[in-house]
């Protein structure tokens, strides 16, 4: 008998990101909502609904967030059972210079030491997510949205990227890369770019919905300007018929996105409970 041997090529990104807990985001599939699942108004600086996703708002409008249960068609497209839904219940058609509306996830610093920020070996990160939106006052492609990575330790640095949709109310997958030298800068690879090894916040990931001129700036370059959105940021609060959905959020090392990491529910819940645990009086 003869035995034939075959050789299979395994792509480098698969090998590099095949470890457990590759996703730096906790509850990126929005399965855990210890505080509330029903529509709840944004409260500045607070967690109101989905675990690990904090609200930041200072506008004349009102945003609400809630858990959205995906249809079978949604699941077939995104591979996810839930999404984070934002609706506008009070409009603000003119965002003031010092006003803002965002959600963000703070990522614990001691879990980020492998990024090697503050050195010439700093790692590239890739963000992937599914999202959809409706913007009544604009075509889908003209409505630019912003997502920002912020390193707060020592000197705070910000890197904003833009994204837009092809059609209203249609799921689209986004893959966005954050290079440590984006914009030909050395802010992250110098010592001031380091992330302190402690239990504080090492990185923030922000999604913007309406920011005034004091909090907007150039995209695609690291800055220290304190900008949470680009100057092209669309104002989601302009119309009470507007909405925005997101699910499958993953931030990982490397310059390519890999498949979303589905963790067991009990594991993901325990990760959320490190920061907040709701106890029931019933036994």
Locate each region found by the language model.
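Short, Lys/Arg-enriched N-terminal segments with co-localized hydrophobic residues
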Residues: 1-4
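Extracellular and organelle-lumenal recognition/adhesion modules and their flexible linkers in secreted
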Residues: 6-283
